[in-house]
Amino acid sequence: MRPFRTLVKVLQKIESSPLTKVFMAFIIVVLIGSYLEFLTQRNVKYSEIKNYFTAIWFTMETVTTVGYGDVVPVSNLGRVVAMLIMVSGIGLLGTLTATISAYLFQIRIERRGKLEKRLKNHTIICNWNAYTRNIIEGNRDEEAAPIVILSENTDNSEKYQNVFFVKGDCTSEDDLKNAAIEDAARVVIMSDIENNAIPEDLLDAKTLLSIFTVRKLNNAVEIIAEVRDEKNKKHAVSAGATEVLSVGELSSRLISRSISNPGLTDFILKSLSETEDFKIFSIEACGILPGMTVKDAASNLAEVCVIISVISKGKIEYPPDRSYKIGAGDYVVFLAKNKKEVEEAIKG
């Protein structure tokens, strides 16, 4: 009984499909039109439509606008039937073509709901807004970790190398699982400012809910979140975020410092740009660094970078004490032309 029920469900799904309905209508027009043409032409003198197959051949020539002209109706009644076939058949064929295109497009959209291949240690960026594109552009290194964009709005996004798009909502556990949240190394939660369905004063609420959901599914993943209101930063940390950024706070502080420090804004922006010769990087202490003082590390790495800070257990050492011993798990912040050169130098 179970196979029979499954077959019934499949047939019901096929029957309810718009593509099936249009296709069946097209077949009916072809079969009925061919039969009427056959009836009107089989006894007409000089007519070449003497059997049903030839009538079908003529009908298909007509609806597909091929028009070989090898078979044509002779009588006036046959020509009237041919005109009806032209009007109904050609219209249905156009509708069928459009329906097939829409069906294939829908399949492509549905496939975006899941990754086509399994990823590990990737970065998931939740929500698409004006800043998301800049994040992708800044992480287009060939050896960079794969990026998965999880958003309801991905239709207008471009294709990038090593970037995958999953259509969904970052507050949904199922959608996060489709983006392989269990194996992700980090999650970046952008404010969903382009979602017109969410009032501006509730954007941070969605961000907090997203943090809760992500942390529930992966307790070890690094979560970087953006909030609109600086007051919600502590709530985001309580929800499980590793780092919390407020665009408004960054902008206001940068402008404030630039008033009495000419050139500071230009320096900071250039150090964060992908097009400049020097950039700010951070790297977890490994290789020769653990156990080494900041002074010795700066001396060993002088040819490839300038150490500007050390972050230990969330505490920022700036400027770092020259006698401070770098520990395992610390992060070293530096200025350099190329991060790979620093990584190679650290290996020893």
Curated annotation (Swiss-Prot):
What GO cellular component is one of the record's annotations?
Answer: plasma membrane
Any Pfam family matching the protein:
Ion_trans_2
PROSITE patterns found in the cross-reference section: RCK_C, RCK_N
Q: Residues in domain RCK C-terminal?
A: 266-348
The RCK N-terminal domain is annotated at 120-246
InterPro entries noted in UniProt: 2pore_dom_K_chnl, K_chnl_dom, NAD(P)-bd_dom_sf, RCK_N, Trk_Ktr_HKT_K-transport
Q: Which residues cross the membrane?
A: 19-39, 52-72, 80-100
- Mutagenesis or variant effect for L115N: Abolishes expression of the soluble RCK domain
Annotated phenotype, changing R111N = Reduces levels of the soluble RCK domain
Subcellular location per the Swiss-Prot or TrEMBL entry: Cell membrane
What membrane topology term does the record carry? Answer: Multi-pass membrane protein
What keywords are assigned to this protein?
Calcium, Cell membrane, Ion channel, Ion transport, Magnesium, Manganese, Membrane, Metal-binding, Nickel, Potassium, Potassium channel, Potassium transport, Transmembrane, Transmembrane helix, Transport
Q: What is its main location?
A: membrane
Q: One GO molecular-function annotation for this sequence?
A: metal ion binding
The task this protein performs is described as: Calcium-gated potassium channel. Can also be activated by Mg(2+), Mn(2+) and Ni(2+).
Quaternary structure, per UniProt, is:
Heterooctamer composed of four full-length subunits and four soluble RCK domains.
The protein's matches in PANTHER family, at most eight in alphabetical order, are given as: POTASSIUM CHANNEL PROTEIN 2-RELATED-RELATED, POTASSIUM CHANNEL PROTEIN YUGO-RELATED
Its name, as the record gives it, is: Calcium-gated potassium channel TvoK
| Organism listed in the record | Thermoplasma volcanium (strain ATCC 51530 / DSM 4299 / JCM 9571 / NBRC 15438 / GSS1)
